[in-house]
């Protein structure tokens, strides 16, 4: 498993705690709840993602609502919301990462923590977001 994938997994677990039980973000990002060894690179990447989502959550949630077609944010599972949040952040703030890689990572995380059906939903929403919000702004 790549360090970026582990970092995304850690970020997802942090965001889940923050969203579901209201854990303070700084407390969650200490990772003292995680019982496996974490490299500095994995932790730094997870912290980057969590801080980015926390700081931009309202704007990201507005985008999720826009592209989730007939789904209220509250109807989307906590795991799926968190995956969407960190993936939209990556698409917006990490232009050096290829969009298909970010979207594939989101799909893989969804398969790992949710269902195949959820993975299709995540893939469709992120693809639509990318094509309408990111792709038109990329240099051609």
From Swiss-Prot:
Involved in transcription antitermination. Required for transcription of ribosomal RNA (rRNA) genes. Binds specifically to the boxA antiterminator sequence of the ribosomal RNA (rrn) operons. Keywords: RNA-binding, Transcription, Transcription antitermination, Transcription regulation. Belongs to the NusB family. Pfam families: NusB. The gene is nusB. The lineage of its organism: Bacteria, Pseudomonadati, Spirochaetota, Spirochaetia, Leptospirales. GO terms for cellular component: cytosol. One of its GO terms (molecular function) is RNA binding. InterPro entries: NusB-like_sf (IPR035926), NusB_fam (IPR011605), NusB_RsmB_TIM44 (IPR006027). This is Transcription antitermination protein NusB. Disulfide bonds: none annotated. GO terms for biological process: DNA-templated transcription termination; transcription antitermination. Gene3D superfamilies: NusB-like (1.10.940.10).
């Amino acid at each position: 498993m790549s360090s970026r994938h582990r970092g995304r997994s850690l970020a997802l677990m942090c965001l889940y705690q923050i969203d579901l039980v209201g854990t303070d973000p700084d407390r969650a990002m200490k990772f003292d709840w995680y019982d496996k060894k974490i490299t500095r690179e994995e932790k730094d990447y997870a912290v980057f993602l969590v801080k980015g989502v926390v700081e931009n959550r309202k704007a990201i949630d507005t985008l999720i609502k826009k592209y989730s077609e007939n789904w209220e944010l509250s109807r989307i599972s906590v795991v799926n919301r968190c995956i969407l949040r960190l993936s939209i952040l990556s698409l917006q703030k990490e232009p050096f990462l290829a969009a298909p890689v970010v979207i594939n990572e989101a799909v893989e995380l969804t398969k790992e923590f949710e269902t195949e059906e959820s993975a299709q939903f995540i893939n469709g929403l992120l693809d639509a977001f990318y094509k309408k919000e990111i792709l038109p702004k990329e240099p051609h």
